[in-house]
C-alpha cells in the first residue's frame, strides 16, 4: 500500500491495482469540513472509511470523525462489521425530525486478498474497471 501527497492510496496484490483518492470542500464560510476519511492498516489488512456528518461545521466534523475513527479502528481489530455498526449507532445522536443518524459512512475492507464494500446512507460507490471502460471520444 502506498500513499501519495494528494491524500490518495494505492493498493496492489496479485496483479490487481486499486487507487483511491478524496477531496473535501468546506461549505462557504465554514472552518471545518463535515467529511472525514480514515485509513487503518496492519501487515495484511487495510480499512478505508469515508464518513459524512450531516449538516455542517463543528457538529458535522465531530460526528464524521467519531464515526470514521470508531469504524476503522474496530474493523482493523477484527470486530465484526454488524457489531461495529451497532456500537456506532448507539453512540451517534439521531435527528428527531428526519429520524436519521447524524453521520453516514462507506467502508472498504481489504482482508488479505478479499475486498468488501459496505455503505450506510451514502450514495452508491461507482466501481470502475479500466479494462472494461469505454471512454467517450470527442467528435
Predicted regions: what they are:
Residues 30-41, 133:
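Acidic loop->beta-strand submotif enriched in PP2C/PPM serine/threonine phosphatases
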Amino acid at each position: 500500500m502506498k500513499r501519495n501527497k494528494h491524500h490518495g492510496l494505492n493498493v496492489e496484490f496479485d496483479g490487481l491495482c486499486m487507487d483511491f483518492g478524496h477531496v473535501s470542500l468546506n461549505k462557504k464560510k465554514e472552518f471545518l469540513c463535515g467529511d472525514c476519511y480514515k485509513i487503518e492498516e496492519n501487515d495484511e489488512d487495510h480499512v478505508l472509511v469515508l464518513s459524512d456528518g450531516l449538516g455542517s461545521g463543528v457538529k458535522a466534523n465531530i460526528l464524521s470523525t467519531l464515526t470514521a475513527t470508531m469504524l476503522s479502528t474496530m474493523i482493523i481489530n477484527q470486530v465484526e462489521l454488524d457489531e461495529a455498526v451497532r456500537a456506532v449507532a448507539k453512540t451517534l445522536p439521531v435527528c428527531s425530525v428526519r429520524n436519521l443518524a447524524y453521520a453516514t459512512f462507506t467502508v472498504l475492507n481489504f482482508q488479505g486478498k478479499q475486498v468488501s464494500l459496505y455503505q450506510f446512507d451514502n450514495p452508491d460507490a461507482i466501481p470502475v474497471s479500466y479494462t472494461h471502460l469505454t471512454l467517450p471520444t470527442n467528435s
